[in-house]
Amino acid sequence: MTTITKAACIGGGVIGGAWAARFALAGIDVNIFDPHPEAERIIGEVMANAERAYGMLTMAPLPPRGKFTFCRSIQEAVEGVDWIQESVPERLPLKRGVINEIDAAARPDALIGSSTSGLLPSDLQAEMKHPERMFVAHPYNPVYLLPLVELVGGRKTSPETIRRAEEAVAEIGMKGVVIAKEIEAFVGDRLLEALWREALWLIQDDICDTETLDDVMRYSFGMRWAQMGLFETYRIAGGEAGMRHFLAQFGPCLKWPWTKFTDVVDLDDALVEKIGAQSDAQAAGRSIRELERIRDENLVGIMHALKAGDGGKGWGAGKLLADFEKRLWEKGGSPSKSLDASGPLRLVDTKVNAAWVDYNGHMTEHRYLQLFGDTSDALLKVIGVDFAYVEAGHSYYTVETHIRHLGEAKLGQALYTTLQLLSSDEKRIHFFTRIHDAASGDVIATAEQMMLHVDAKAGKSVPAPAEVMAKLKPIAEGHAKLDAPDGAGRHVGQKR
């Protein structure tokens, strides 16, 4: 299995910066080279958007965030890395020169991907000394959320390189689609180009404005495409007779003059101004960053809906998200260091991110419950109740929870949790969790909870196996010597 342990991003604009965010959120350190004087600020803003999106996207345990290192040269950036992603402006001489420089300085086995939207990989690798490890890795914006990457080899690209690239992107939650033959603009951008040309004609000829055109897409076939694509959508349109009936019914339409996309619209100053003015009105004063955040929230919602599709197995991008989360849970594993049961167990360290706060900048109620849940999950991993254990059919279910809010958690605040076992037996675990401010140690919230060991298939409680009880025993013995926590046993409305 090919994995990326360290990456380099050459070019840190919209695409390059988002690649860097995707790598970093997968726990990969990233070297960045971009001569733009504000590259660090730009990439920092992209990273902030990405962290906010991931905070909404998944509750699976993400690895520690990879570190950004801004380098002074391409040579410095590519030294010792596994994957190099080139994302410089779309000009063949510039890209070819940058790729040649990467080729000369990179490790012989390092993978070199280009984010080009349409240039042929054979043209990009023409002057390389090691062209066999170079390929197109064409993503879609925002790279940190949209999982697709088109993998396109050139004439000199080895099949082994494409295989390694496909494995590597899967490990960071992406869907590597291998394009069988190289062609300008590959697959996705050729489809987008056709749609874009027709859209420009519709605006040019005053058939509609930009908002009307976007409404037609987002309230209709755009929703279908997000979950079934083009051909599967049309298969359904053919009814019980399927695709062949659809083609027989609508095939003759191809000879009708319904489109103008084979003609190139004259994108003159007047049309540019027309589209620009309509787009400004459509944005209604929202900044690009605001629109990006709205886009990201909507994409997260779509992926969550797709994750629940096909009877809970996941569908399309949602199934990919479910598979990625499964790997994250498996990698979360048990803590690498032994835990000291002479005091409450410190199990989770985190920071309040933008996805966790309300309009007041305070952490929302359900995020407190999420953090308590993350802590109980961490305890279960300590005693051997990991993903494989759950997949085998047994688990612990939470049956009772009492939360107290004693303070406020705010955006950017560092937090940690501690857990104290109150009692346990072969079926039950009764425990008390505190959320602390990392700087002062003050307790912000507490939760007293009870979990039952269950046979998930039978739908009933059953005794935990001996190996789980053996791991729970030293914690129970250590915590039996501790004073009862303040607040344990309280109920709602209880007088002090």
Swiss-Prot record:
Cellular component aspect of the GO annotation: cytoplasm
Keyword Membrane: no
Main subcellular location: cytoplasm
Residues that coordinate or bind NAD(+): 11-16
Known catalytic reactions: carnitine + NAD(+) = 3-dehydrocarnitine + NADH + H(+); N,N,N-trimethylglycyl-CoA + H2O = glycine betaine + CoA + H(+)
Region (L-carnitine dehydrogenase): 1-335
BP GO annotations: carnitine metabolic process; catabolic process; fatty acid metabolic process
Domain of life, per lineage: Bacteria
Xref: Pfam families: 3HCDH, 3HCDH_N, 4HBT_2
InterPro entries, A to Z: 3-OHacyl-CoA_DH_NAD-bd, 3HC_DH_C, 6-PGluconate_DH-like_C_sf, 6PGD_dom2, HotDog_dom_sf, L-carnitine_dehydrogenase, NAD(P)-bd_dom_sf
Disruption phenotype: Disruption of the gene in strain Rm2011 abolishes growth on gamma-butyrobetaine (GBB).
Record function comment: Multifunctional enzyme that catalyzes the NAD(+)-dependent oxidation of L-carnitine to 3-dehydrocarnitine and the cleavage of betainyl-CoA (N,N,N-trimethylglycyl-CoA) into glycine betaine and coenzyme A. Can also hydrolyze L-carnitinyl-CoA, but with much lower efficiency. Is involved in a L-carnitine degradation pathway that allows R.meliloti to grow on L-carnitine as the sole source of carbon and nitrogen.
Family: In the N-terminal section; belongs to the 3-hydroxyacyl-CoA dehydrogenase family. L-carnitine dehydrogenase subfamily. In the C-terminal section; belongs to the betainyl-CoA thioesterase family.
Quaternary structure, from the entry: Homodimer.
Stated name of the protein: L-carnitine dehydrogenase/betainyl-CoA thioesterase
Source organism of the structure: Rhizobium meliloti (strain 1021) (Ensifer meliloti)
